[in-house]
């Protein structure tokens, strides 16, 4: 029986969301690395004492599925009696937490009130380097997680707010950029205890511990009820979707990802059991992030205003077969999981769209990445960037450019000024790739291009996935294009790579051109509004040849569209 009235529940829920936002703002402002303060590859959340999410407002929705497993990972090794007020725990092991790969480290802080653990605050953030063969710990040659850098089961990062000496020594000796790793972790831990725990304690002082913990349960039940109410309106049945991700071990092999959205009354089950067996290479993805993606898709289809909390997990089930790409067995590598997760997002949305009877959305582009680290005796750094590409088109609108897959839409491109001021590179080109967006009545988001001039010997890792299976169009729309990495383009020693690569040696003066993939289009290109075609042509989004051959514009119209307007005297 609820002891907190509905109005108080909603006030407490809003306060929890505010606390999460404030924690995230603190991490952003105090983080050391560009991956935190520029790319925004981090989040924060609040769980109850069992690890059920009660507050999360993340720019990266899959993190919703990660925090329960991270807290449970800590509880697997530490009892409540072994915790003290001000302790912070650190974990990154993909098979003992919700962390998708070792680069993502989570800080977990138990919140004490009246002498007992009442909740946990947690923050996940990508780390620039945690050791391993390649700078940035991005290694396509990894055949187990031990080749992907430092693996940490739960350990103390702070003991009663005092840095844990042994943990800090461990981190310093296993990173090319220890000051960034420890600095970012300090930002996360500081946000949790100085804002998260402090605000939660004040909330419980104000409303009472029992009322707040009761509200934790009630706001989850309300989310569950709302989701079930809408699912019950859908037609019972099985709705399937599939897509592909490229294997890293065999670049000519596609791995099939499959989902069945099963609607049964007010219950939705997403069954991924027909997905291909796991790869030997680091393209596999552990279940927690896929679950988070499922919850995010359900919210998007039902009501974007639904609070993110454990009620989603009670209304949406996920089923996996062990030993598949989406549920690999220990110690299978998972370092490039995000390249697979972009396809997972596409097929989940396709299946749920069918179940909900809503128009399909073209597949999103898979965002690329740039990781460059110095070698030899020069200034030591690891340059880590996310290259956010384009969204898929939908019936009624073009896909956005420069946002990447929707689940990473809260991440951002690092500015040219920051890159050139902090790393030994010069940006020679930053532009959109003409004719890249999947053609259609509604065009897919375009690919991005960046060219870097290297100013000291370095090693490169990154690229774009889905070379064999670019983002799919829908309803007659065309597919997007694949991405590529070209070393010294246009020169006699030009080298072009597709897919994901690592450990590519670069010399001073080399030029690296990175082009991301692009998103699919929706509808027949010949049905695209003529004014939209002309505007795309004038903006350089499409070429005159494409305007004529693909969109049906006459050569005269194309020429006229690009003719300079007469000056008005």
Give the positions of each predicted feature.
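Glycine/proline-enriched, intrinsically flexible loops and inter-domain linkers
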Residues: 1-85, 90-113, 117-569
């Amino acid at each position: 029986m609820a002891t907190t009235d509905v109005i108080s529940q909603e006030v407490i829920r809003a306060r929890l969301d505010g606390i999460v936002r404030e924690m995230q703002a603190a991490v952003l402002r105090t983080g050391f690395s560009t991956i935190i303060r520029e790319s925004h590859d981090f989040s924060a959340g609040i769980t109850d004492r069992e690890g059920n999410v009660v507050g999360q407002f993340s720019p990266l929705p899959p993190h919703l599925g990660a925090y329960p497993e991270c807290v449970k990972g800590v509880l697997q090794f530490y009892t409540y009696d072994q915790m003290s007020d001000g302790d912070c725990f650190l974990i990154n092991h993909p098979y003992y937490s919700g962390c998708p790969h070792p680069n993502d480290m989570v800080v977990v802080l138990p919140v004490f009130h009246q002498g007992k653990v009442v909740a946990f605050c947690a923050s996940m953030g990508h780390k620039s380097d945690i050791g391993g063969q390649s700078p940035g710990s991005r290694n396509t040659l990894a055949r187990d997680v031990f080749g992907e850098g430092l693996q940490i089961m739960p350990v103390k990062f702070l003991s009663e707010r005092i840095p844990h000496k042994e943990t800090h020594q461990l981190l310093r000796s296993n990173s090319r950029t220890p000051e960034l790793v420890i600095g970012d972790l300090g930002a996360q831990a500081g946000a949790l205890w100085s804002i998260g725990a402090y605000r939660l304690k004040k909330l419980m002082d104000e409303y009472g511990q029992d009322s707040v913990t009761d509200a934790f349960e009630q706001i989850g039940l309300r989310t569950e009820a709302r989701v079930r109410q809408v699912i019950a309106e859908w037609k019972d049945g099985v709705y399937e979707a599939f897509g592909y991700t490229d294997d890293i071990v065999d670049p000519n092999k596609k791995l099939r990802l499959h989902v069945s959205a099963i609607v049964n009354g007010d219950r939705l089950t997403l069954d991924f059991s027909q997905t291909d067996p796991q790869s030997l290479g680091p393209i596999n993805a552990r279940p927690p992030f896929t679950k988070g993606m499922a919850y995010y898709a359900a919210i998007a289809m039902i009501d974007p205003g639904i609070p993110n909390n454990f009620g989603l997990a009670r209304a949406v089930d996920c089923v996996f077969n062990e030993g598949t790409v989406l549920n690999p067995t220990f110690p299978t590598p998972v370092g490039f999981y995000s390249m697979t997760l972009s396809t997972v997002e596409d097929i989940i949305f396709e299946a749920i769209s069918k179940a909900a009877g809503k128009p399909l959305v073209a597949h999103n582009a898979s965002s690329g990445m740039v990781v460059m680290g110095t070698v030899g005796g020069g200034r030591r750094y690891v340059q880590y960037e996310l290259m956010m590409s384009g969204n898929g088109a939908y019936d009624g609108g073009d896909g956005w450019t420069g946002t990447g897959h929707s689940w990473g839409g809260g991440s951002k491109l690092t500015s040219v000024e920051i890159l050139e001021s902090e790393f030994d590179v010069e940006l020679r080109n930053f532009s959109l790739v003409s004719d890249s967006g999947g053609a259609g009545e509604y065009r897919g988001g375009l690919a991005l291009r960046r060219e870097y001039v290297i100013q000291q010997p370095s090693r490169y890792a990154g690229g774009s996935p889905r070379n064999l299976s670019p983002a799919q169009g829908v309803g007659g729309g065309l597919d997007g294009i694949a991405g590529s990495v070209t070393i010294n383009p246009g020169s006699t020693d030009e080298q072009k790579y597709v897919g994901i690569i690592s450990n590519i040696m670069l010399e001073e003066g080399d030029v690296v051109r990175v082009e991301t993939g692009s998103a699919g289009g929706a509808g027949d290109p010949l049905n695209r509004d003529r004014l939209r075609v002309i505007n795309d042509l004038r903006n350089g989004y499409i070429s005159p040849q494409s305007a004529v051959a693909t969109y049906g514009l006459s050569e005269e119209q194309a020429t006229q569209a690009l003719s300079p307007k007469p000056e008005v005297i």
